[in-house]
Amino acid sequence: DGTITTSYHHWDGYPAGLGFNLVNNWNTAEKIAPAIELGDASHWGEKIGDKIDFDVRGDGYYEQNVYYHRDRGEPRINTSPITYESYAVFEKVFMRNQPCGEDYAYILRQDGTFTQVHPYTNEIKHDAEDSIRAEAARMQRLIDQEAA
Protein backbone atom coordinates (compact mmCIF):
# COMPACT_ATOMS: atom_id res chain seq x y z
CA ASP A 1 0.00 0.00 0.00
CA GLY A 2 3.05 2.28 -0.08
CA THR A 3 3.22 2.96 3.67
CA ILE A 4 6.43 2.76 5.70
CA THR A 5 6.24 1.32 9.23
CA THR A 6 9.20 2.06 11.46
CA SER A 7 10.49 1.40 14.93
CA TYR A 8 13.38 2.85 16.88
CA HIS A 9 16.51 0.79 17.52
CA HIS A 10 18.94 2.00 20.18
CA TRP A 11 22.24 0.11 19.94
CA ASP A 12 24.75 -0.10 17.12
CA GLY A 13 22.69 1.70 14.48
CA TYR A 14 25.71 2.30 12.25
CA PRO A 15 26.05 0.38 8.94
CA ALA A 16 28.51 -2.24 10.27
CA GLY A 17 26.18 -2.89 13.23
CA LEU A 18 22.43 -2.80 12.66
CA GLY A 19 22.81 -2.32 8.90
CA PHE A 20 24.86 -5.51 8.60
CA ASN A 21 22.45 -7.40 10.86
CA LEU A 22 19.50 -6.31 8.72
CA VAL A 23 21.00 -7.39 5.38
CA ASN A 24 22.01 -10.75 6.88
CA ASN A 25 19.04 -11.63 9.08
CA TRP A 26 16.09 -9.32 8.39
CA ASN A 27 16.03 -9.11 4.61
CA THR A 28 12.43 -10.06 3.79
CA ALA A 29 9.12 -8.45 4.68
CA GLU A 30 8.03 -11.73 6.28
CA LYS A 31 10.98 -11.60 8.69
CA ILE A 32 11.14 -7.89 9.45
CA ALA A 33 7.44 -6.94 9.76
CA PRO A 34 6.76 -8.95 12.95
CA ALA A 35 9.97 -7.59 14.50
CA ILE A 36 8.99 -3.99 13.76
CA GLU A 37 5.45 -4.62 15.03
CA LEU A 38 6.86 -5.29 18.52
CA GLY A 39 8.00 -1.66 18.56
CA ASP A 40 11.07 0.17 19.76
CA ALA A 41 14.03 -1.96 20.75
CA SER A 42 17.24 -1.65 22.65
CA HIS A 43 18.94 -4.26 20.49
CA TRP A 44 18.22 -6.57 17.55
CA GLY A 45 19.87 -9.96 17.25
CA GLU A 46 19.32 -12.75 14.74
CA LYS A 47 15.75 -13.55 15.84
CA ILE A 48 12.77 -11.99 17.61
CA GLY A 49 13.05 -14.39 20.53
CA ASP A 50 10.90 -14.61 23.64
CA LYS A 51 10.42 -12.23 26.55
CA ILE A 52 13.61 -11.93 28.59
CA ASP A 53 14.83 -9.86 31.51
CA PHE A 54 15.82 -6.54 29.95
CA ASP A 55 18.64 -5.91 32.40
CA VAL A 56 20.28 -9.36 32.48
CA ARG A 57 22.80 -9.69 29.68
CA GLY A 58 23.54 -13.39 29.94
CA ASP A 59 23.44 -16.22 27.44
CA GLY A 60 21.16 -15.54 24.51
CA TYR A 61 20.69 -11.83 25.21
CA TYR A 62 22.62 -10.71 22.15
CA GLU A 63 21.17 -13.42 19.91
CA GLN A 64 17.63 -12.06 20.04
CA ASN A 65 15.79 -8.77 19.86
CA VAL A 66 15.28 -6.91 23.13
CA TYR A 67 12.21 -4.65 23.20
CA TYR A 68 11.31 -1.78 25.49
CA HIS A 69 7.66 -2.81 25.86
CA ARG A 70 7.88 -6.60 25.83
CA ASP A 71 11.08 -6.99 27.85
CA ARG A 72 11.30 -3.86 30.00
CA GLY A 73 7.58 -3.22 30.42
CA GLU A 74 7.51 0.34 29.09
CA PRO A 75 4.05 1.53 28.02
CA ARG A 76 3.19 0.38 24.50
CA ILE A 77 1.97 3.85 23.58
CA ASN A 78 5.54 5.15 24.04
CA THR A 79 7.21 2.34 22.10
CA SER A 80 4.81 1.59 19.25
CA PRO A 81 5.89 1.53 15.62
CA ILE A 82 5.16 4.64 13.55
CA THR A 83 3.55 4.36 10.12
CA TYR A 84 4.16 6.98 7.44
CA GLU A 85 1.87 7.30 4.43
CA SER A 86 4.77 6.99 1.96
CA TYR A 87 8.54 6.72 1.66
CA ALA A 88 8.66 10.39 0.60
CA VAL A 89 6.90 11.48 3.81
CA PHE A 90 9.17 9.28 5.94
CA GLU A 91 12.32 10.63 4.30
CA LYS A 92 11.21 14.23 4.73
CA VAL A 93 10.31 13.77 8.40
CA PHE A 94 13.41 11.73 9.22
CA MET A 95 15.83 14.07 7.48
CA ARG A 96 14.29 17.07 9.18
CA ASN A 97 13.59 15.79 12.68
CA GLN A 98 15.41 12.57 13.60
CA PRO A 99 12.76 12.05 16.29
CA CYS A 100 15.09 10.19 18.67
CA GLY A 101 18.42 11.45 17.40
CA GLU A 102 18.96 8.46 15.14
CA ASP A 103 22.14 8.41 13.11
CA TYR A 104 20.82 6.10 10.38
CA ALA A 105 17.59 4.69 9.04
CA TYR A 106 17.31 1.52 6.98
CA ILE A 107 14.33 0.82 4.76
CA LEU A 108 13.66 -2.60 3.26
CA ARG A 109 12.16 -1.75 -0.12
CA GLN A 110 9.50 -3.80 -1.87
CA ASP A 111 12.11 -5.02 -4.37
CA GLY A 112 14.14 -6.54 -1.50
CA THR A 113 16.88 -3.89 -1.47
CA PHE A 114 17.77 -1.65 1.44
CA THR A 115 17.89 2.12 1.44
CA GLN A 116 20.21 3.70 4.01
CA VAL A 117 19.50 7.25 5.18
CA HIS A 118 22.08 9.30 7.09
CA PRO A 119 20.63 12.68 8.08
CA TYR A 120 23.84 14.22 9.39
CA THR A 121 25.47 14.04 5.96
CA ASN A 122 22.20 14.31 4.00
CA GLU A 123 23.15 11.02 2.36
CA ILE A 124 20.61 8.60 0.95
CA LYS A 125 21.91 5.33 -0.50
CA HIS A 126 19.50 3.16 -2.44
CA ASP A 127 20.52 -0.47 -2.94
CA ALA A 128 22.83 -0.03 0.05
CA GLU A 129 23.71 -3.67 0.76
CA ASP A 130 27.14 -3.53 -0.90
CA SER A 131 28.16 -0.38 0.98
CA ILE A 132 26.86 -1.85 4.26
CA ARG A 133 28.90 -5.03 3.72
CA ALA A 134 31.97 -2.97 2.78
CA GLU A 135 31.64 -0.94 5.98
CA ALA A 136 31.33 -4.13 8.06
CA ALA A 137 34.49 -5.50 6.40
CA ARG A 138 36.32 -2.22 7.06
CA MET A 139 35.32 -2.32 10.72
CA GLN A 140 36.44 -5.94 11.03
CA ARG A 141 39.85 -5.01 9.59
CA LEU A 142 40.18 -2.26 12.20
CA ILE A 143 39.25 -4.68 14.98
CA ASP A 144 41.78 -7.21 13.67
CA GLN A 145 44.52 -4.55 13.49
CA GLU A 146 43.80 -3.43 17.03
CA ALA A 147 43.96 -7.03 18.27
CA ALA A 148 47.27 -7.73 16.50
Predicted regions and their residues:
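Short, extreme N-terminal segment that most often corresponds to the first beta-strand
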Residues: D1-Y14, L18
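Low-complexity intrinsically disordered segments
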Residues: N24-A148
